[in-house]
Curated annotation (Swiss-Prot):
The lineage of its organism: Bacteria, Pseudomonadati, Thermodesulfobacteriota, Desulfovibrionia, Desulfovibrionales. GO terms for molecular function: metal ion binding; phospho-N-acetylmuramoyl-pentapeptide-transferase activity; UDP-N-acetylmuramoyl-L-alanyl-D-glutamyl-meso-2,6-diaminopimelyl-D-alanyl-D-alanine:undecaprenyl-phosphate transferase activity. PROSITE patterns: MRAY_1 (PS01347), MRAY_2 (PS01348). This is Phospho-N-acetylmuramoyl-pentapeptide-transferase. Keywords: Cell cycle, Cell division, Cell inner membrane, Cell membrane, Cell shape, Cell wall biogenesis/degradation, Magnesium, Membrane, Metal-binding, Peptidoglycan synthesis, Transferase, Transmembrane, Transmembrane helix. It comes from Desulfovibrio desulfuricans (strain ATCC 27774 / DSM 6949 / MB). The gene is mraY.
Amino acid sequence: MFYNFLSPLASEWTFFNVFRYITFRSMAALMTALLISIILGPRFITWLRRLKCGQYIHEDVAAHACKAGTPTMGGLLMLFSLSVSLLLWADLTNIYIWQAFFVFAGFGAVGFWDDITKLRHHKNRGISGKAKMGGQLAVACVAMLLLFVNPDYSSKLTIPFFKEVTFDLGWFYLPFGVFVMVAASNAVNLTDGLDGLAIGPSIVACIVFSIFIYITGNARFAGYLLVPYMPGVGEVTIFCAALVGAGLGFLWFNAYPAQVFMGDVGSLSIGGVLGYLALLCKQELVLAVVGGLFVAETLSVIVQVGYFRWTGGKRFFRMAPLHHHFELKGVPESKIIIRFWITSILLGLMALSVLKLR
């Protein structure tokens, strides 16, 4: 809003020229979302308690019994903070801003439906797997179609760490893109099992993609770093910054011991939009690097289920996802969280190294 109303005044008052800079508006968007989350957080948590939106805890993890009743659906706070920040600082005529917001809100709506169902049934099982997958596929399909019909968008798959190595998937890029968004959404959802465990790596991934997206939208930087250039995409840097701010504000209350959980409304939306951001800046495979922690958590579940069926009842891990395995081995929750955060930061740095190793 500030960009649309104030930047035209720069021709008469040079001070307003600052609103044209993506870097300035990105920092402002981050701080706005962060402050909104921190200021409104206590009231929001109190409101959730009044509505009795308490989390139902997995019975197999005895150490989590004390967390029963902790308010959930904290992702709504992130959605509100993000929305206000975007309204103030983003260029509201930019189609990519609206597409990113659609993905975040769309996956969030599926998560909200799942969370509400859990609360109504008073157990830790929400909507059916088919219903959840159907909702995710619907949102991802719409988002991919919007990207695919864009003449500036390419169906080429970029291979990280290699100079100008691409594969044109053609129409197969559509289902591939849908898979990326849905897989990322569910991967973050699986990781959201300890206080602050999912939001920390999500913030790191969002920071990494904000850098890639800024470069993708800048013709000079994109040409120098051999990144596919897409005009207008740089504005999504503001979306990324606002999401980082909203995530940090949420982490203020979600850090161990958590006062609120993000719920599926938060985890599904964050994962889905991370997938979209990777597709938007043509760094689809880099998502597997910066989101390596999410990949490991997902693979642990796949291995556990496959091994259980193959051996007729034996388990490969003590419990899946992976963070529960470490819990049952006696590693303190706070130590697991910090170590996973450190791992995600290292993976983020590795992902950024793609820019120079090309």
